[in-house]
């Protein structure tokens, strides 16, 4: 997977090498490898979800969002123009651990990501501009780039379906 300008920042190229595995395993192999040892009948994150609900009920929003970021929960931020959505996003991004691989998808470069393992991808809003790809195509590309997190700055039109 190679992403070059203008889909990424000028002066950067993102290269992700994917190697297909020649190994073919059956269920017994997966069992011996311990794949099923972490499977639970109920949700894997019951404790985290309960803690999030408790923080919400207590109105402890700072702790709520810290835990949500730590637990890699999807967070949707919405509001009117000028209401602070981007500023709030930047505050949450600071909570992401430094070792994680972060990909951003934006039509206008707004997000500041202090973590070093990051790729900023850009698309043309409404098909205008040098980039010939949209958010949907960049999202598909991002999934092949082994991200820990994908930060999609604006979600509009049918792209929401794919996210």
How should these model regions be labeled?
Residues 1-70:
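P-loop NTP-binding catalytic core
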Residues 62-80, 91-163:
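Switch/coupling sub-region of P-loop NTPases
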Residues 87:
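Conserved Walker
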Residues 84:
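Conserved glycine(s) of the Walker
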């Amino acid at each position: 997977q190679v992403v070059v300008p203008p889909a990424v920042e000028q002066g950067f190229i993102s290269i992700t090498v994917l190697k297909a595995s020649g190994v073919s395993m059956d269920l017994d192999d997966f069992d011996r490898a311990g794949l099923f040892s972490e499977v639970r009948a109920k949700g894997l994150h019951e404790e985290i979800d309960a803690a999030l609900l408790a923080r919400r009920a207590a109105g402890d929003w700072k702790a709520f969002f810290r835990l949500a970021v730590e637990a890699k929960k999807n967070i949707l931020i919405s509001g009117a123009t000028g209401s602070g959505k981007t500023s709030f996003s930047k505050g949450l991004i600071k909570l992401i651990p430094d070792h994680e691989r972060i990909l951003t998808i934006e039509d206008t470069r707004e997000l500041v990501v202090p973590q070093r393992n990051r790729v900023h991808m850009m698309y043309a809003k409404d098909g205008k501009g040098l980039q010939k790809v949209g958010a949907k195509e960049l999202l598909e590309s991002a999934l092949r780039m082994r991200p820990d997190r994908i930060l999609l700055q604006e979600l509009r039109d049918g792209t929401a379906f794919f996210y």
